[in-house]
Amino acid sequence: MVLSAERAVFAVLCFEGPDRYSLAGGLGSRIAGLTEALAEAGAQTHLYFIGSPDAPGVEERVGGRLILHRWAQWISRYYPQGVYQGELEKLYDFNETVPWHLVDQVVRPAADAGRHVFVLAEDWHTADLLCRCSDILHGAGLRRQATLVWNANNPMGFERVNWGRLGYVSNLTTVSRYMKHYMWGLGQNPTVIPNGIPAALLAPVPAEAVAALRTALGAGAPDPVLVKVARWDPDKRWLMAVQAVAALRGSGVRARLIAKGGIEPHQAEVLEVARRLGLRVGEAHAGERPSTQSLAAALAGAREADVINLRGFLPAELLQALYGAADGVLANSGLEPFGLVGLEAMAAGALVFTGATGEDYARPLQNALVLETDDPGEIARYWHQLQGRPDIAARLRAAARATAAEYAWPAVIEVLMHRLDYLAAQTGR
């Protein structure tokens, strides 16, 4: 019989988490979706993460089945800028204290109740922590009551990982075939369990929100509004994006780019290149409590710009509205371990340009436009090919939504249960 959520207890270890303070990219979104989906499936789920210093240390959600353990709050009070400010101090506290709490407060009570615990740890910050958990479990005589799993979302921090020790005490997983092949080069063979998106993202984007944003931008055929949401990182191919806008404008298409990044320094280089290409760069901010109305007003104020640098935090529902309002979404990374933004944009029914590395969900000209090069002309050429063929664009958008549904968290949880059932039965780790 395949493992069921009701028969297991899950403990998820991750630096990022669902708090705004703890969200720095796709990892926080992944963990929020994963843990909520596990709890909704009936599993008692504990999440240990670096949480907001202003929120409760322990919080119950989903009818008490999801328990949030906000860690290192006393340190976070000195670092108000987010989860990675004061990173090493927080990491030291995480490594030194979480394993003991996990064993005493989660594994031991579960074992006494006859339930098996699955410890799911994410990325390099938790590699040493998981090894310590294994040692403490052995010392407590509880090692066989827990299955340890370490998941790699990307190669960041791989140089810090003791692969021999980690591979000995835990089962390794990753999020795409690209990452599996990458890790082969390190002598590891992880099991692939795909990422997921909240099922709520599959709800149709409100037509009034799409209309408000497009009206604010003065959007309309034949001049496209393109959207790119990513960290300001060279791997995300921001330069390719602004160069594609310049190429389209050079061919007579008045393309514009809404750029939503983070606080990374690569931003300055990208915007300077845009200016050198003759593009007008503007800035928009939807406010501390963004809404459709405030976002529309901010975009309207910058509508004359060719590149609009959208600053500040946007909740998921506004990002989905932005994807739905766009004529195209550029998820054109050169190195993408999975590509969560591309999948989220697909859920909104967007016309998505993806890269060709870890985006296992993307199928060329079936549900996305898959870019094989770093040539901005490839984006421009695809755009020109689609003009006069609204049937192709409509087919891609419909197929994109269907694909996104296959990666909703409830569907991914089913895959996860099958994989964990095998790992627990075969490896004994």
What are the roles of these predicted feature ranges?
Residues 334:
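Aromatic "clamp/platform" in nucleotide-sugar-dependent glycosyltransferases that forms part
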